[in-house]
Amino acid sequence: MKKDIHPEYVDCTVTCACGNTFKTKSNKSEIRIDICDKCHPFFTGSEKIVDSAGRVEKFKKKYAQK
């Protein structure tokens, strides 16, 4: 690898919307995510709707029975 052309590789704190945090390595020092393994329905076994931008309401409004 060439010297002085690669971004710095630092410790990173990943923060989920549910409050879970964990450490990893990245080019960024902090990353925020919407869903992680502690709150994802596949891993928890519970079903919940994740709608951060109102997409479900927009879909229902667009395709509502008239």
Curated annotation (Swiss-Prot):
How is the cofactor bound here? Binds 1 zinc ion per subunit.
For activity, the cofactor(s) needed are: Zn(2+)
Give a GO cellular-component term: ribonucleoprotein complex
Q: Which residues form the signal peptide?
A: none
SUPFAM superfamilies listed in its UniProt record: L28p-like (SSF143800)
**Domain of life the protein comes from:** Bacteria
Gene3D superfamilies, per the entry: Ribosomal protein L31
Q: What keyword terms does UniProt attach to this protein?
A: Metal-binding, Ribonucleoprotein, Ribosomal protein, RNA-binding, rRNA-binding, Zinc
Q: Which residues bind Zn(2+)?
A: 16, 18, 36, 39
One GO MF term attached to the UniProt entry: metal ion binding
GO aspect biological process, one term: translation
PROSITE patterns assigned: RIBOSOMAL_L31
Kindly indicate whether the keyword Transcription regulation belongs to this entry.
no
Task: State one Pfam family annotation.
Answer: Ribosomal_L31
The record's family statement is: Belongs to the bacterial ribosomal protein bL31 family. Type A subfamily.
Q: What does this protein do?
A: Binds the 23S rRNA.
Q: How does it assemble?
A: Part of the 50S ribosomal subunit.
**Protein name per UniProt:** Large ribosomal subunit protein bL31
